[in-house]
């Protein structure tokens, strides 16, 4: 291959060195290496370098550069191993380089999927309104092993899930339209399901709120009932009652309450 004729520190980056090699055919080859690679291979002026050694040096320097890229990526927040792998692939790193970099990152505790999973769950339950199923899906997408997902989700207790689900319920309640209780329960149940809460949490929230809904249920029935009344008042009495009951029942109101409403209309001579 040749002999090292000069080693000089780079002006703009004092942690990298330019190495000049006088090749056997008289040509000069100049390449750069990290200071750690320089020390690792004990490079010095006058040293003979063969092709195999040169390739080892180039590979080691590529590992070092990729390692620095990974550290930069990790400087913003904790990452899963899969996130690091995906990032380095986008940067053009080979599989073997990435494997060596990951090994070094693990050794230095810069990546740890178990710690990442626990930190992720803590952050999500404290700063978002996500249920455990959504968090699980996100961790799976980030490449975290099932073992760490199971362990980390265990810190999201049932009571904490209920409290988070209740806060979502309270926000949604402010925007509730004139709906039957059955429709409302279905709607809020779907909302909590999409947010990733298990059925037992949803049931607990809906059960704890049912007592305060009777008055709202009647208000919703009156609202929908008067709309239906205006639509069907042209019909004779038997047909009118049939259409009213069908319309309000489809809206989710119980038959007993519908009949009470119709009696109230009759008593008030609304027809």
Curated annotation (Swiss-Prot):
GO terms for biological process: regulation of DNA repair. Pfam families: RecX_HTH1, RecX_HTH2, RecX_HTH3. Transmembrane segments: none annotated. It comes from the Bacteria. InterPro entries: RecX_HTH_1st, RecX_HTH_2nd, RecX_HTH_3rd, Regulatory_RecX, WH-like_DNA-bd_sf. Coiled coil: none annotated. It is found in: Cytoplasm. One of its GO terms (cellular component) is cytoplasm. Keywords: Cytoplasm. HAMAP family: RecX. Modulates RecA activity. Belongs to the RecX family. This is Regulatory protein RecX.
